[in-house]
Amino acid sequence: MFKKILTAALLLVTLVLTGCGGGGGDKSAETKADNKNSANKLVIYTSMKESLIGGIVEGFKAKNPGIEVDWQSAGAGKIMAKLEAERQSGHLMADIIWTSEVPDFYQMKNEGLLEKYQPAGFDELLNPFNDYDGSFTAARLGTLGIVININKIPTEPTSWETIATDPLYKNSFGIADPALSGTAFMSIALLEKQFGWDYIVRLHDNGATKSKGSGRVVDDTADGALNACLGVDYITAGKIDKGAPLKMVYPKELLMVPSPVALFKDADHKDNAKKFVDYLMTQEAQQKVAEAGTVPVRRDIKMPERYNLPAPEDALANGIKINYSEVLENKDDIVKKFSNLFK
């Protein structure tokens, strides 16, 4: 997982991944230096967008008004690069990590970075991990589908095969870069598992293009620069809520990507981190997950009809099954093959 990264790239990532919450702005270097000495603080690194993480943090702060929350959001690849830079400096700043690149969590577990913690109410949760041991817990069952611009695509695609063959999608279907986006990486791994690498090649041959990130590819579809894309549920839902001419279509082979949350073993604010993970699994927080447009991990959540999301049990049952340990072993190869194909 943690590859050797050029110093310049690490510095860039450190600058890019900035504070988005807590005090409402970037944190100074002095504040960062005091991180370990501040008992009433919590630092979260996440790939979740503000439309999802923002409401959850506000709910947590309402129940824990004495805790200052500094949440920092970026793509999974940038987060892992930042963590590697911090490891090289001798101190991880984050208490919690919450992304969708499942293999990273297996690698961090293998390297002894994660604290085992089973959140309160675990028996009420849907667990997608057969080898669960408390090192990380799914906080949502993210789904991806074919997002179409309804002004460009007159009829819904009937299958994954449609976007690899239909001229309507030629040179106008976008995929986020799996080197940057955890959900994109997992989606490519799932599609390869279900249909073989030949399917990815045929997507390329029909003119599919690589975009920078999971948000950008949905933006480009909403703006009409693309006719369609491989899109994340809640990012698409947020655009639809703002009036974008988009629709999410789910083929029967469902792309379900769990989003694990974990505590770092050397976290400076471990008690606060446990409180946050406990809150994240509550009915209140999981209802916020659903209202943001993605699939919660609790069965007792009322799903918003406007997003056409699968029920949590259905997402777990119908998602393409994959061995995450095997995906970890093949991660570099998958990213390299994709990058060589989609230059």
Give the ranges of each region predicted by the language model.
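Periplasmic-binding protein-like
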Residues: 128, 142, 201-203, 210-211, ...
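C-terminal motif of bacterial Sec signal peptides marking the signal peptidase cleavage site
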Residues: 16-19
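Early extracytoplasmic/lumenal segment of secretory-pathway proteins
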Residues: 33-106
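Mature extracytoplasmic/periplasmic domains
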Residues: 264-321
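A ligand-binding cleft/hinge motif common to bilobed small-molecule-binding domains
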Residues: 103-107, 227-245
